Amino acid sequence: MAPHTQQLTTAPATATTVPAVQLRGLTRSFDGRTVLDHIDLDLPAGQFTALLGHSGSGKSTLLRAIAGLDHEVVGSGRLTAPERVSVVFQDSRLLPWRRVLDNVLLGTEGKEAAAKGREALAEVGLAGRERAWPNELSGGEAQRAALARSLVREPELLLADEPFGALDALTRIRMHVLLRELWERHRPSVLLVTHDVDEAIVLADRVLVLEEGRIGLDLVIDRPHPRSYREPVLGEYRERLLAALGVTEDVD
């Protein structure tokens, strides 16, 4: 089946549009069922992209393919990604037998590693918690530590698979602000997988909708940051994305 993409708004070509990630004809199948269907996609260097879709649409499969974590699936196509890739999941995946700083430094080497780890923890608001155990952290603090762990590797590409899905509403808003600030400071390419349309609109500069294993909508959010949920124009983007997801809202 041929891929199809609907581009509602096109960003002007700039030096930053050099692809950090490039997919050509990417296909992935499980038990004879096609989950990703010949996807062609470019993610420019430094772009913040969000990926929406129903459960089972292939969002996490696409992220895992880009991360190189899908060795046991049947697939084809061409995939190019940067060498330095960090992944943040919904579960912080902190090792309970290691202190926070040791978790952040896991897999890193060099004399400056500890200093970089402390700096990363300070960036996410966890200065002074280096010696804490993971079970002493709140859910939001654990995700902050996970972000610090990703930052210390100085990634060219940050993949985030519903990182705030288990957090309460207020903590999610705070984490939205933090993630955007970290992106503006470090400028990695970001691919954020989420079920939350509002989260995608507030954070991302481009939103993709995955539908039956294909990119059904490719929408550039051409609005300055910081953004407010109350902006009327964001409501227009929201309606387009919900329509692409097959959701309609009744307005009184």
Give the ranges of each region predicted by the language model.
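Helix-to-loop junction immediately C-terminal to a conserved catalytic motif
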Residues: A67
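A short, proline-enriched helix->beta-strand linker immediately N-terminal to the Walker B motif
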Residues: V152-E156
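The feature captures the beta-strand-to-loop junction immediately N-terminal to the Walker
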Residues: L52-H54
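Hydrophobic anchor residue at the start of the ABC signature
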Residues: L147
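Conserved ABC ATPase signature
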Residues: W133-L137, E141
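Catalytic Walker B motif of ABC-type/P-loop ATPase nucleotide-binding domains
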Residues: L158-D161
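Conserved structural motif at the start of ABC-family nucleotide-binding domains
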Residues: V21, L36-H38
